[in-house]
Amino acid sequence: LKSEGIGADCSSYTELLMSDAVGLKGHDIMFSSNVTPAEDFKKAAELGAIINFDDVSLIDFYEEIGAPFLETMCCRYNPGGNFTLHNEIMDTPKDAKYGMTKEQMKEAFTKLKAHGVKHFGIHAFLASNTVALGYYPKLARILFELAVELSKEVGVHIAFVNLSGGVGIAYRPD
């Protein structure tokens, strides 16, 4: 995968070690985790991975453990409510335990900016096993509108928007 220019989406220390073993480093690794042990954060920082904070409280924990704030960091957004497409509920972000509200995103970006972070990413994962063609355009609109708002209100550089996974497989033809 590395030779094809594909990186790794890691959520654990073991996955970080596996990425390192195949030569992935830096922005080739996105580290998204919740209930994250200190050693996982430190390993992700050591590898220069893009650390994707799932909860605003993790930023304080990250500071407490003495992990270095990197130039580029990311936060996971959860818009709440139901994520619908063509009157069909794709998933229910309001019930998800992952991600931050818009106000928490502002707080998180403000904290990260105060720690010297220069480039910010926004990530969201709103539905699983998605085969609907309109999912990614709708998700992109939500995230890019948020990016503009955060850039203006918090005064940060939004370096990227990550539409995450959730790609489904149509096991039977429609």
Which sequence ranges carry the predicted segments?
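A conserved active-site cap/scaffold subdomain adjacent to cofactor or substrate pockets
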Residues: 167-174
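Active-site-proximal beta-alpha core segment in soluble small-molecule metabolic enzymes
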Residues: 1-160, 169
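Structured binding elements
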Residues: 163
